[in-house]
Every structure is written in structure tokens, then in C-alpha cells.
Amino acid sequence: MPRNPRFCFFLFLLFHSSLFFSIPCFSIDEQGLALLSWKSQLNISGDALSSWKASESNPCQWVGIKCNERGQVSEIQLQVMDFQGPLPATNLRQIKSLTLLSLTSVNLTGSIPKELGDLSELEVLDLADNSLSGEIPVDIFKLKKLKILSLNTNNLEGVIPSELGNLVNLIELTLFDNKLAGEIPRTIGELKNLEIFRAGGNKNLRGELPWEIGNCESLVTLGLAETSLSGRLPASIGNLKKVQTIALYTSLLSGPIPDEIGNCTELQNLYLYQNSISGSIPVSMGRLKKLQSLLLWQNNLVGKIPTELGTCPELFLVDLSENLLTGNIPRSFGNLPNLQELQLSVNQLSGTIPEELANCTKLTHLEIDNNQISGEIPPLIGKLTSLTMFFAWQNQLTGIIPESLSQCQELQAIDLSYNNLSGSIPNGIFEIRNLTKLLLLSNYLSGFIPPDIGNCTNLYRLRLNGNRLAGNIPAEIGNLKNLNFIDISENRLIGNIPPEISGCTSLEFVDLHSNGLTGGLPGTLPKSLQFIDLSDNSLTGSLPTGIGSLTELTKLNLAKNRFSGEIPREISSCRSLQLLNLGDNGFTGEIPNELGRIPSLAISLNLSCNHFTGEIPSRFSSLTNLGTLDVSHNKLAGNLNVLADLQNLVSLNISFNEFSGELPNTLFFRKLPLSVLESNKGLFISTRPENGIQTRHRSAVKVTMSILVAASVVLVLMAVYTLVKAQRITGKQEELDSWEVTLYQKLDFSIDDIVKNLTSANVIGTGSSGVVYRVTIPSGETLAVKKMWSKEENRAFNSEINTLGSIRHRNIIRLLGWCSNRNLKLLFYDYLPNGSLSSLLHGAGKGSGGADWEARYDVVLGVAHALAYLHHDCLPPILHGDVKAMNVLLGSRFESYLADFGLAKIVSGEGVTDGDSSKLSNRPPLAGSYGYMAPEHASMQHITEKSDVYSYGVVLLEVLTGKHPLDPDLPGGAHLVQWVRDHLAGKKDPREILDPRLRGRADPIMHEMLQTLAVSFLCVSNKASDRPMMKDIVAMLKEIRQFDMDRSESDMIKGGKCEKWQPQPLPPEKIVSTPRGSSNCSFAYSDESV
């Protein structure tokens, strides 16, 4: 029978195809079994891999599995699962066909198995965003076909192996946000195909960027930010013809930017900020026609800004601030049509603002403050209709504020303070509906405040003080419902304070002092007010009873006016009042007893130069926190016994009254100069000796009516007084000439009582300037006595006296007195029995409060209150300079007291604008304690109160984690701040960093701790200007316990209600910096270190 050729051919195909398909069937089963075995070794929670079943013969249909055209497993891709354990690799070795292994965000721990190096077909290995530790195994670098290696966001340690050069096909290498150390291997130059290299966020990565990096000719992204790379950028970087992003910010680079950078013609983003780069900006950058973002701020760049930058048409962000640049702002910047942000603050630029900038119609941020720019503001600025921020404060600008500025209807903040501007404020400025901040203080502006101000309904902060403004305060100001802060002091305003001001329902701060205002105080004022200064005007009438409704008021200054009548008793409802100054007015009647019912009255009470009669109210004995009392130049009578127990009094003036009787026999009154007692003809000094102290017999002496009339008597009294004081303190006649003693409280002891107890057995601590002893005096009272390290410690000794001797706060250690001679300097404080916060946290403290969150919260809130008082309530402000857990002492109920003011500094307000004190003075950096010092201590940057804020943030982290900032157990010798930052950058559970003694608490308590963690991160921002002010920190901490508990922990760790302070994390390719200067936030760094 003849054969059919077609039929034979069909049988042939059928036979061979059955052979072809029969072989993989066994192979697939084998790979399926290997995968099931691998799954069994994973600690998987839930049913994430429920589709992986032995009953399914074909694994190609399983979740996360892909096969090639031959039915072999080629890809394993599993994401966002919870494996909770190490990565097993033994079974994976059997899947030789595997080309892609991606296990991201699956909570892998342990080390990377070296067996992965046997997967010879592997092209993609992605183990990012896990908790892998240990070193990168060298075996990985045997995978010659590997194109993508992603190991970022883990806890990997060790060095980057030099075998990296074997991966000649590698296209993408991401190692960022680990704990890698050592240098970048020179073998990286072998990777000719490498397009992406990101190893930022490895703080211990050091050495120089190798020259060989220039051999990576395919490189598109080079990200090595937030490392310890040092030295110069190699000139070979110019060989990277395809590179689009170079991110090497927040490192230790030095030397100049190489001219060869101009050869990188594809470059779009250059981020070199926060280094120590010197030299000038290369002219060759003008060749970078695709450049979009140029961030070089906070370096040591000098010379002129090259005109050639104006030939980079794609530029939209230029930040060269905080350098040493000189010369003019290039006119060529007007050729940049896409420019959105130009930040040149804090340099030494001169010349004028170029009119050509008006061509940059997309400009949103123009910040040129803190330079030496002169001339007028060009009228063409009105063409910048997209402008939202215009900061030009602290320059030498002259002329008028151009009316055309009102055409910039998107403006939100204008700060032209500290210039020489003149003329009137353009009416049109108040037609800018989005304007929230208008700061024009310290100029020569004149004219009237226009009624148009009422149209500016979003205005939040208005500072016009220190000008020559005249006329009335317009009634339309009452339309500003959002106004929080108004300062129009030191002008020439007249007329009444408009009653419409009561409509400013958000108002907290009002300063109108030193004007010519008349009329009375409005009967109704905003209940939100915290600060009122109307002193040095011509206001009349009586105080309205409505003053009692201001329950948030802390400071009220009405001095140097013409007020009359009696003080309303309703003032006692001002329960937060700390300072009350009614001096130099025409008040009459008796001082109301109700003033003694204000427990917060601690800073000052001034009722001098009025017509008060009667006696000092008996309730004044309750003002135990009061520091300064002035009732001089009145018609007060009676005795002064009611003041005898005011132990916190530092200053008292009762002169020119009609007081009589015996002066209280206390040390404070015995030390008062006669000038504060004079013209009280019925007043006399006690003749009774003090118990236990040898005294010279004195006759009763009438206090003189006038120093001029009884000059000789005064001199005799002063001489006797001086001798008696020295004799009482020392108890030794032979030491009368050697010791200088000042006591602020009544203390019965001799110098010998103190000195003999300064032994090693009584040491309770050490500070930055001395050692502290516990000393019990004969009366049984226990003191803390600090002995300065050496007689050369004059600065620290004087700092303690000058600072603590003039301030009072419930959370600041109380200085009881001091003494010194040529060889010894001693300071006397209240003794606090529970040691320091440091000893409480780290095992040596008394009591069991160390593990209690509520106690820790109260401690840090108290310290925040103390620092806020120093920074914002003291005039001038005070910097502590050494905030650390050791300097936070604990009272009998574990209440906190800030101590050790040996490094404290008085801060001049010169050069400060809008309360932003990030640039207060040019003094050299302060000393501090290692581990707590802010980054600016390591450079020539200004040290400000924001440095205290950083140290406070470290203390917060110490309280939350229970770890010392330099805890030797932190991996890789990391600092506490970096350890926490790395943990959170790895998107790990923030609860894991909490002190084990704090974990396992109820959800509301955990919420509090996580929110406090968010506050601490604001405090430890690398840039001082990014850190909040202490008064805002207090507000945030107080708000935490009233926080909406429905918010998620992830929201809170990003800032919670504090997020208005949080720098917005953006990948570098999308960075648009936020303003510095007058605002309190600025671009800091990307959340993803590149």
C-alpha cells in the first residue's frame, strides 16, 4: 500500500512534539517542588502564597512566578509581604533558569545568602527595603549576566567589595540607605554599562570619589549624598557625557568644582549643597544647556556668580545661598524664561537688583536677603505675577517700595526689613489677597497706614515697627480675622486704638509702644491676646473691666501713659500674667488685693510713679515667684512685712512713699541699696543681731529723707553695712578681706561650713565648668555647691551669675548666691534630690520613674518651657549653650530644672528679623557637649538659639529610646540621631526604636510617643533654619495630649499636627526648595538619599 507523504510527515511531527513537551513536564514538577520546599522555609504570615500548592502541577500560574517560553521558571517577584525571617537559598539553586529575583518590602532579616551567586542566569536581583544585615557576599559578583542589583534600604554593613568590577553588564546599582563603610572601589570604573549608581545615606562611606568613576561613560544618575565622602570632585567627572543627575549633597567634599563639569552636557540636576566646596563657580557651567536645578547652598564658594549661567535656558531652580559670593546679581539671569526660584541669601553680593529679572515671569521665590545690595527696587518687579516669596531684608536698599509690587497678586510673604526704604506703603499692597506676612520694620517709611489694609484678609503677621508712619490706625484693621502678630511700635501714630481691633479674633501679639496714641483702651479686646505693649504713648482714661477676659495674657505693658482711676479688680482673672507694668501713669486708689491672686506673676510688677495710697495688699505675700517689684513714687504707707517672704525677689524699689516701721530683718532687705529705700521717713533698719552670727552692735538709724541732705550718714551706714555683711558670711575675722559674697536668699552658714564639705565623698556631678557637691549647712538645709574647675573660669562663673541672677522660671535651677576669692569660686543652688535626667534614664537615678512615659513627658515639657523662656521671654534672649540630659536636674517629684549656665550667652537682637533668629550674630561658635552639639558647631556658621533646639531634640530622642547619643551599642558607632534617621528611612516600625521599658503601652500612649518622636525630628534638622522655635515646640508638645487619636501612626511619624514644620521629602529629580530667611522652613534633603 503506498505511503501518503503528508500522513508520514504528520506522524513525524506528532512523535517529536510529544518528545519535546514531555521533557519540560518533569522539569516543571522539579522546579515546583523546589519552590514549595523554599516556601516551607519561609516564615510567612497569612495566606500570601496560598496559590503555591502541590496539587497545581504548573508553578507558572502561581502568584509571583513567571516562566519563559519553554515553561521554565524565570522570575520570582514578591512584594509587600511579611516573611519575618532570613532568606533561604538552598532550594533556589535548583532553579537554574531564574533570571529575576525580586523580594522587596517583605521583611527579610539576616544576611544575604552566598548561594545566590550560583544562579548564573540571574539578570535582576532586587532585595531592597528589607532588614537584611551583614556584609554583601562576594559570591554575588560572580553573576556575570547581572544587570540590576538593588540592595538599598537595609542594614547592610562592611565595604563595597572590589569584585564589583566583575559585573560588566551591570546597568543599575542601588545601595543607598544602608550602613556601608569604607571607600568606593576603583573597580567601579570597569562598569561601562552602568547607568544608575546610588549609594547615598551610608554615613560611613568615606574617602574620595575615585577618578575611575569617569570611566562609567553610560552613567545617567550618580547619587552619593549624605555620606562622609571627602576631598575634591575628580576632573574625570567631565567624561560622564550622559549623566543627568549628580547628587553629592550633605557630605564632606572640599576643593573647587572642576571646570570639566561643563562637559556633562546632558546634566539636568546638580546637588552639591551642604559641603565645604571652595573656589568659584566654574564659568564652564554655561555650557550645561539642559541644566534645570543648581543647588550649591551652604558651601564656601567665593568670587562672582558667572554671567554664563544665564545661558542655561532650562534652569528653573538656583540656590547659591549661604556662601561667600561677591559682585552683582548677573543681569543674564533675565534670560532664564523657566526660572522659578532664585535664592541668593546670606552672601556678600552688592550692586543693584537687575531690572532684567522682570523677564523671569515664572519666578515664584526671590530671596536675596542678608547681602549688601543697594539702589532701588526696580518698578518692573510688578511683571513677576507668579511671585509668592520676596525676601530682600538686611540689605542697603533705598528709594520707595514700588506701587507695581501690588501687581504680584500671588505674593504670600514680603520681607524688606532692615533697609533704608522711604516713602509710603503702597495702598495696592493691601489688595494682595494671598499675603500672609508683611515685614517692613526698621526702614524710613512715612505716610499713613491706608484703610485698604482691611482688604488683606489673609494677613497673619504684620511688622511695621521702627519707621516714621503717622496718622491713625485704620478701623478697617478689624477685618483681619487671621491676624496673629502686629507690631507698629516706634512710629508717629496718633489717635485712638480703634475698638474694631476686637474683630481680630486670632490676635496674640500687639506692640504699639512709642507712638503718640491717645484716648482710652478699648473696652473689648481679642481674648486670644498673649502680649500687649502700649507703653510710651498718651493713652488716657481708666482700665476697662474687660481686661479680665484676657485669660491667655502673659505680658501687659501700659507704662508711660496717662491712665487714671483704679486698677480694676477683674485683672485677677488674667491667670497667665507674668509681667505687669503700669508705671508712669496717674492711677489712684489702693492697690487691689486681687493682684496677689495671680500665681503666674513672676517676671515683674511695676506700679511706680502713680498716685496709689493705702498699704501693700496682704495678698502680695502669695507672689512667691515674683522677681521684680517696683512701687516707688506713690503715696503708700504701712510696713513692709508682707514682702518678707518673697524669696524670689531679685529687685525691689519702694522709694518715695510713706512707709514706716522696721525694715524686714532678712538678708535680701539688708543688702538693698539706700537709693531704693529713700524718702520713707518712718522707715528704719533693725538693730537686732542675727542668731549664730557675730555682729557689731548698731544703733537704730532712721533712713534719711534725702541722700543729699544726709550724705555723711549714708556713707557711714554703707561702710558699717559692708563690714557686717562680710563678717556674717565668713564667721572669721581674718577672712573679711579675702571673700566676696552675694546671697539672694536667707542662708545661715559660714564659708568654712561650705569649704570643709567640698570633699570627694560629697560629689554629686560635674558640669561644663565645675564639679558639684552636696553640702549640708548647720541649719540642716542641704545645698548644691558648684566649685569652678579653676580660678581661670571667670567667663563661666560670670555667665552663671549674670544669667541665673537675673531670671526666674519654675523649670530653671535657682541660684541662691555665690562667693569667690583669689583661689576659689563657688555657686550655691537648691539641692535637687533625684539627680539628673541622664542618671534616671541610664540606671543611676533614684526612684522608678525612669520607665514611666508620663514622667518622661513632664520632664521634657518642663525643659521646653525653660528654653522657650530663655529664647523668647528674656530681653535680650539667652542661649543656654549646653543642653543635655546631664544638665536636666530632677526635683523631689521628678519635676525638671535646667541647670549649668556656664556656657550661656546673651544674644543681641541686631540683625534679626521676624523672629527668625537663625542668623543672630557673628560671634564664634560656642562650646558644648559632644553628642548634643548641633552641626553648625563644626563649621564657621552662626551659633543661635536654634543650636539649643537641636540639643533639645537629641535629649528628646534620648528620652524616647533610652540610649545615650553616643551609645557604644549603636551599630557602626553611629550617632543616636543618625541611627533613628536610618531606621525610619528604612520604613521600619518606629515603635522598635523606643526604649524597651516604654513598649507595649496602650494605643493612646503609643500615639503620644510617636508624635513626640516627630517633634524630635523637627528639632534635629541639619539646617538651623528648618528647626522650629522653642515656643512652637512647647505648643506642639502641649497639643500632643489633646491630639485626635484617630490619626494613623504613619501620619504622626511624618509630623502629625506638626507637619507644617516638616521639610517635604521629594526625590531629587523633583526637588523644589522652600524658602529660608523670614520663613521658618527650608529645603533640607530628600527623604530618599541618592
UniProtKB/Swiss-Prot annotation:
Catalysis: reaction(s): L-seryl-[protein] + ATP = O-phospho-L-seryl-[protein] + ADP + H(+); L-threonyl-[protein] + ATP = O-phospho-L-threonyl-[protein] + ADP + H(+)
Cellular component annotations (GO), alphabetically ordered: plasma membrane
Segments carrying motif Small peptide recognition: 176-177, 198-201, 221-226, 249, 271-273, 319-322, 341-343, 389-393, 415-418, 437-441, 461-463
Any one GO BP annotation for this protein: response to temperature stimulus
Positions with a binding annotation for ATP: 764-772, 786
Family: Belongs to the protein kinase superfamily. Ser/Thr protein kinase family.
Protein name as catalogued: Leucine-rich repeat receptor-like serine/threonine-protein kinase RGI4
Protein's organism: Arabidopsis thaliana (Mouse-ear cress)
Taxonomy of the source species: Eukaryota, Viridiplantae, Streptophyta, Embryophyta, Tracheophyta
Protein's gene: RGI4
